[in-house]
Regions:
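Solvent-exposed edge beta-strands and adjacent loop segments
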Residues: 2-90, 136-151
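Acidic-enriched, low-complexity/disordered segments with a strong bias for Aspartate over Glutamate
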Residues: 27-30, 38, 53, 68, ...
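Short beta-strand and beta-hairpin "edge-sheet" elements
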Residues: 56, 121-165
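Extracellular/virion structural assembly segments
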Residues: 70-134, 164-174, 184
């Protein structure tokens, strides 16, 4: 399912659509993680493929790198030298799901280098705000599970470089039905 199809379904089924003025809580289900699986036909983020069908988790984490240095009369000081965005994705196998068919393909499972780097977006369906960048897809398990259980998969997604801010409403102005002015944090 594409980003635009997912948002249309959320609007129809649950009355949820991105609004810059949204304030309130967000649940895990309020975030979309999507990747570009075909650069020739998916030229806009709205056409990218959403990671959702039979997915139990797409947890985002920020992994900071640091350097400790000792200074005279100051002692040890920790400096932050960078941050890498990572996602942990796992769920039940579902043949025919566009995301899983791509992510669990032979090309991705056994690929190396730039063959396994894809553009991604990660944003809130409540506000439309998030990030975009490129990431490495690393499949850790393509078929897991015990006897009589659903087959499972697990993968890590690690950003390449620093992602940039992303706003779905700015990238897709026709989706912006919010007439209220955004509230600054």
């Amino acid at each position: 399912m594409t980003v635009s199809e997912t948002l249309a379904a959320l609007k129809t089924q649950k009355g949820i659509e991105p609004k810059a003025s949204y304030t309130g809580t967000e649940d895990t289900d309020d975030f979309i993680f999507a990747v570009q699986t075909d650069s020739s036909s998916q030229t806009k983020e709205s056409a990218w493929i959403v990671c959702a069908d039979h997915v139990k988790e797409h947890s985002g984490a920020l992994n900071a790198t640091t350097a400790d240095e000792a200074f005279i009369r100051t002692g040890t000081v920790t400096s932050k030298t960078g941050t890498q965005r990572t996602f942990s994705i796992n769920g039940n196998r579902c043949v025919g799901d566009d995301f899983q068919d791509f992510a669990l393909s032979h090309k991705i499972k056994y690929g190396t280098g730039s063959d396994v780097i894809v553009p991604y977006i990660y944003f809130s369906i409540r506000t439309g705000k998030g990030e975009s960048g490129s990431a490495v897809l690393i499949v850790n398990s393509d078929v897991g599970g015990a006897a009589n259980a659903s087959a499972t998969f697990a993968m890590d997604v690690k950003a390449v470089g620093t992602p940039v801010e992303f706003d779905y409403l700015e990238a897709n102005p026709q989706s912006n039905t919010d007439t209220a002015k955004p509230v600054k944090a």
